[in-house]
UniProtKB/Swiss-Prot annotation:
Organism: Yarrowia lipolytica (strain CLIB 122 / E 150)
GO MF terms held by the record: L-lysine N-acetyltransferase activity, acting on acetyl phosphate as donor; L-lysine N6-acetyltransferase
Top EC class for this record: transferase
Gene of this entry: LYC1
EC number annotated for this UniProt entry: 2.3.1.306
Activity modulation notes: Activity is inhibited by 5-aminovalerate.
Presence of keyword Transmembrane: no
Protein name as annotated: Lysine acetyltransferase
Length: 392
């Protein structure tokens, strides 16, 4: 059996005809191909960085497939030096029903773990521009994935982390927790570029964020990522983090806008909220019935209450609450705000409790990571700042 890159457009579409059964959601196969090729395939994050791979048996039959996505990242070494490199995220791991139960997925992942597909296409200049770190070391290449099958991938060397998250229910009423204003960005003075009248009795204004607002904030955060990343402690020999630049947001928001008509909801115009120096950006996941927080940057823990209330208000007033009934915040956002922004865990927990959030295990999309170089795979490494934003 051999692992090979799938380069033929026709074979890539044929591969999608199988994965569509798992991830097609509301889409026909034609719409699914359009989303992958045109809507997402041409986003800067995917263009020339997304590759398809197939496992082939001796007669040439493709029995399993997956995708890899190359993105710039930082790695801090045991000597304290920070270097930039490429990560190769693995997604869309799929075995057609007729080939299941024969160990093909295991064979494919063993071959993926051997490093066959992980040849960098990003130039050093691309990586330096994205990371701000001029010391590029591609021997430190990393391959993350987000497991939907528990600890399955750990036997091939991937190191799993937490699947803890916080869930905030949305009851569909016109106003949530005292939030006022109309966030939809089309009518009234409280649109995307306007402000609400404050939430929960606070006088501070909450601003709803347009797509461009989110990109502007992402640019600011990406420029400080190296210094923020350095603050994050690690117990092992290495730590790794994918750069949270605007290209990652572009991919998520393009999905949400494209899928809206198929989910029979308005195309979203609001993608986050901000109060003072605190902000969050979100992604509408209609098939999961979730508004997932891509990023939460908190100057004060109590601002989380305002931002969650604003998110609930957006869902209720902008016509999404019939399709989306919960807000999801991954545990990694709590960790990042505690370490990088110096907020106490207790204060964040109190804000989550005040927002009626509950902590639970996701059971899916479990972040895991491994070095590409075999000689490094036995070294302990921590995957930091790997919330929903960098999921793929």
């Amino acid at each position: 059996m051999s692992l090979r890159e799938i380069t033929s457009p026709d074979e890539i579409r044929d591969t999608r005809s199988f994965s569509h059964l798992e991830w097609g959601a509301f889409l026909s196969i034609d719409d699914y191909n359009h989303r992958e090729e045109i809507v997402l395939g041409h986003t800067p994050m995917c263009k020339n960085r997304l590759k398809s791979w197939g496992l082939y048996i001796e007669d040439g039959t493709r029995v399993a497939a997956c995708e890899t996505l190359e993105r710039p990242a930082l790695v801090q070494c045991k000597d304290g030096k920070i270097k930039s490199t490429s990560t190769f995220s693995i997604g869309a791991v799929f075995t057609p029903k007729e080939h299941r139960g024969k160990g093909y997925a295991s064979v494919m992942m063993k071959q993926m773990a051997s490093g066959i597909p992980f040849k960098p296409t990003l130039t050093d200049a691309d990586i330096i521009k994205a990371t701000g770190v001029s010391d590029v070391d591609q021997t430190l290449r990393v391959t993350p994935l987000w497991s939907d099958v528990g600890t399955f991938y750990e036997k091939f060397g991937w190191i799993g982390t937490t699947d803890l998250q916080y869930v905030f229910e949305v009851d569909g009423s016109a106003s949530q927790n005292g939030v006022n204003g109309t966030p939809n960005g089309t009518n009234g003075t409280n649109g995307v570029n306007g402000h609400t009248n404050g939430t929960n009795g606070h006088s501070s204004a909450v601003k709803y964020l347009s797509e461009e607002d989110v990109y502007r904030l992402a640019d600011v955060e990406a420029s400080s990522f190296a210094s923020d990343f350095e603050k994050f402690p690690f117990k092992g020999s290495y730590k790794c983090g994918i750069v949270p630049d605007r290209t990652v947001y572009e991919w998520h928001l393009a999905r949400a806008k494209f899928l809206a008509k198929f989910a029979k909801v308005p195309e979203p115009k609001v993608f986050g909220a901000q109060i003072g120096d605190s902000w969050m950006a979100w992604h509408h996941m209609y098939n999961a019935r979730e508004l997932v927080i891509l990023r939460a940057k908190l100057a004060k823990a109590e601002d989380l209450v305002e931002l969650i209330a604003a998110a609930k208000n957006h869902l209720c007033k902008d016509g999404f609450s019939d399709q989306i009934n919960k807000i999801i915040l991954w545990e990694q956002e709590r960790e990042w705000n505690h370490i990088v922004d110096g907020l106490s865990y207790d204060a964040i927990d109190q804000a989550i409790e005040k927002s009626q959030g509950k902590r639970e295990h996701r059971g899916s999309s479990i972040p895991a990571v491994m070095f590409v170089e075999y000689k490094l795979q036995k070294d302990a490494m921590e995957f930091v700042d790997h919330g929903k934003l960098t999921w793929c």
